[in-house]
């Protein structure tokens, strides 16, 4: 699931199409609800999704975790599926023109958060929980 406007950049468009991703028009509530429902059904049927709940990519973010958009977790809530936080370290360097040599990016899959753990939480609380776990992992490594 990606912002429609940003999904048409070089390489990104190809990846979104290859992975059969969804393009989200940020200010279109009706379309957002449709995508949440589609993603929920896809997930129930076994399809995996990668979400970047920060809602965008900050250039040269230096491994800072920005605020998460609570709506990013609505599909998981609706589908009653686990949320697997993933901490990315140094991924920003790939998109930063200051780094012209090979980049090593770390990908850390954290413990899943099962539906039973988050079922009584609001989506904003889930967003904070996931963000905190990712930030804790990044802080423990850097």
Q: Model-found features: residue ranges?
A:
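Glycine-rich anion/phosphate-binding loops
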Residues: 32
């Amino acid at each position: 699931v990606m912002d429609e406007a940003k999904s048409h950049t070089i390489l990104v468009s190809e990846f979104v199409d290859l992975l059969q991703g969804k393009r989200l028009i940020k200010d279109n509530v009706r379309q957002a609800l449709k995508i949440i429902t589609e993603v929920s059904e896809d997930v129930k049927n076994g399809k995996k999704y990668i979400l970047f709940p920060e809602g965008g990519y900050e250039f040269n973010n230096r491994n800072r975790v920005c605020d998460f958009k609570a709506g990013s977790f609505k599909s998981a809530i609706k589908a009653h599926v686990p949320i697997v936080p993933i901490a990315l370290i140094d991924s920003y360097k790939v998109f930063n023109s200051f780094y012209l040599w090979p980049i090593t990016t770390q990908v850390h899959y954290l413990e899943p958060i099962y539906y039973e753990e988050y079922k009584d939480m609001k989506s904003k609380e889930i967003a904070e929980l996931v963000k905190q776990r990712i930030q804790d992992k990044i802080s423990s490594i850097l």
